[in-house]
A protein has these predicted regions:
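PP2C/PPM-type serine/threonine phosphatase catalytic domain
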Residues: 2-199
């Protein structure tokens, strides 16, 4: 497997969240970063990409900048945009890091509700009443083809470009930055799982 980072959390247990990350068997370095703040109800999983440790740096920037922006009053989408701009600026300042980026998924709790935001193919799943449901939608070439009816679900699972993303923090593509967003409410015994695509 590729590198994988994951965090899961619950609204109703005393042990609110836990996380694990692993570089996988193909890489020597782990480019995933995690931020877990049970007290403020904020969790981030970022999966970096890019040479010269660029992915490691990009994911670390995301996990530092997003909580910082939110602590200063930014909304969740603005926090992702600020992290994106910081990663792009770092790549401009250090040419060896140009092209680095990171997928990201964020959960921010607000009382009995929470909001999620993401860019790329890191995912969030909700476990509720015995069912695991994906809440995020990948920003990927294959997902676009699936939505437009060019691929079936089965074809998408085995497509050779299934891991080619269409957006991430740090991307300077003409398509620009895509951010997905949803709100939901906690129900009894709900769990959320945030993970990189390596899981």
């Amino acid at each position: 497997p590729c590198s994988a980072g994951a965090a899961h959390m619950s609204h109703s247990t005393s042990s609110r969240s836990s996380a694990q990350t692993h570089p996988g068997h193909k890489r020597n370095q782990n480019q995933d970063s995690l931020h877990m703040d049970d007290g403020h109800g904020l969790w981030v999983v970022a999966d970096g990409m890019g040479g010269h440790h660029g992915g490691e740096i990009a994911s670390a920037i995301a996990c530092e900048e997003i909580p910082e922006q939110i602590s200063q009053g930014a909304d969740i989408e603005a926090a992702l945009r600020a992290a994106h701009q910081k990663i792009v600026a770092r790549g401009v300042a250090q040419p060896e890091l140009r092209g680095m980026g990171t997928t990201v998924v964020v959960v921010r709790e607000q009382g009995n509700e929470y909001e999620i935001a993401w860019s790329g193919d890191s995912r969030i799943y909700r476990w509720r009443k015995g069912k695991l449901v994906q809440r995020s939608e990948d920003h990927s070439i294959v997902q676009r083809m699936l939505k437009s009816g060019l691929l079936s679900e089965q074809q998408a699972k085995t497509h050779p470009h299934q891991h080619v993303i269409s957006s991430c923090l740090g991307s300077t593509s003409a398509d620009g930055l895509e951010i997905g967003y949803q709100r939901d409410s906690w129900e009894k015994d709900d769990w959320l799982l945030l993970c990189s695509d390596g899981l």
